[in-house]
Amino acid sequence: MGISRDALHKHRLTGAARKCNYKKRKYELGRQAAKTKICSQGEEKRVRSIRVRGGHQKFRALRLDTGNFSWATEKITRKCRILNVVYNATSNDLVRTNTLVKGSIVQIDATPYKQWYETHYGVVVGKKKSAKKDGEAEQVVKKSASLLAKLASRAKGRVLDSAIESQIGEGRFFARITSRPGQVGKCDGYILEAKELEFYQRRLQKKKSAK
């Protein structure tokens, strides 16, 4: 038995070394960190199951490429690709090595959310207005009266933050991981919005300017 979570090997408050009066116990064992990484090109996700105390199962994710991320203001969740880790309050090494842990700030693919938004509200977002070329005609999609009425009712309550819209244009969202990939084998979280997004954007800007 290697890693142990006991206090027997710790020094006393006085600085004296404790005398070990019993051997390591099974219930005090520790395991190595999963250090979940993002899958490289063409690599499959890797999740291992571990039998733990009480006969339960833990799922140790070693390689992941996707996760379920929720968009709170729109009350939707979509499975999307994780692109890279951009910030971690604990350690810069976890950012450098693209390690997925709870609380990490990652960039995710915005395409699934963009597709849903455009279908749900019937508007085009994140696209720069460009001059039409000669002979280029707009595609007209026929919509039923009931669908137009539905889209009109949805448009009344439609509010899209400018920061979110610019991210949709870039094709990337900032998101926070809320699950524990090394324990549950999944990388789930939520999209950053409003003041929380502003806070992390400031932190990232500060980090860039310090280089």
Curated annotation (Swiss-Prot):
One of the record's GO molecular function terms: structural constituent of ribosome
A GO cellular-component term linked to this record: cytosolic small ribosomal subunit
CDD domains: Ribosomal_S8e_like
The entry's keywords: Ribonucleoprotein, Ribosomal protein
Keyword Ribosomal protein annotated: yes
Keyword Plastid annotated: no
InterPro entries: Ribosomal_eS8 (IPR001047), Ribosomal_protein_eS8_euk (IPR042563), Ribosomal_Se8/biogenesis_NSA2 (IPR022309)
Pfam families: Ribosomal_S8e (PF01201)
Gene3D superfamilies: 3.10.290.70, Ribosomal protein S8e, subdomain (1.10.168.20)
GO biological process terms on file: maturation of SSU-rRNA from tricistronic rRNA transcript (SSU-rRNA, 5.8S rRNA, LSU-rRNA); translation
PANTHER family from the UniProt entry: 40S RIBOSOMAL PROTEIN S8 (PTHR10394)
Family, per entry: Belongs to the eukaryotic ribosomal protein eS8 family.
Name of this chain's protein: Small ribosomal subunit protein eS8
Source organism (scientific name): Dictyostelium discoideum (Social amoeba)
